[in-house]
Amino acid sequence: MKLVCRVLTLGLVLSLAAPALANTEQATQSATEFYQAYRKAFAKAQKIEDILPMMAASQRAKMEKTPADERKMMFGMLKEMTAAQGDVKVLKETATKTGAELTLETKGEKGTATIIKEGGAWKLDKESWTSK
């Protein structure tokens, strides 16, 4: 009986601690680390809806207003372009009032990513690329 009580108590403690630990990890994650996680998630995504939670609310709203067939086509084009980029290197992270601006580089291109904080979590607001 004591063992059952201990197991239940441990389970309760762990269930209460897990969300707190996740929030701590999110709070200590840098904008660069978030962006790298975003790129990995994007590479694995099968549809744009898979990455919408990582996008800023304004960008999510634009995507959600786009007709489903156009969204699918745009996502396919983005997948091709990001795959062609290969590995992206973050050269610099600059703090801003709303989050951070990342200076990026990949083979043949330079880019920037605007990462903002929404509800205490990092979100991708904008990303742009130009040829070197």
Q: Residue locations for each model-derived region?
A:
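Boundary of Sec targeting at the N-terminus
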Residues: N23-Q26
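Short beta-strand segments that buttress and anchor functional surface loops
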Residues: A100-K107
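N-terminal signal peptide c-region/cleavage motif recognized by signal peptidases
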Residues: A17-P19
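Bacterial N-terminal signal peptides that target proteins for export
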Residues: M1-T9
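Short beta-strand edge/turn micro-motifs at domain boundaries
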Residues: K110-K132
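Short solvent-exposed beta->alpha transition segments
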Residues: Q29-E33, A37-K44, I48-E93
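Ser/Thr- and Asn-enriched, surface-exposed coil loops between beta-strands
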Residues: T94-T98
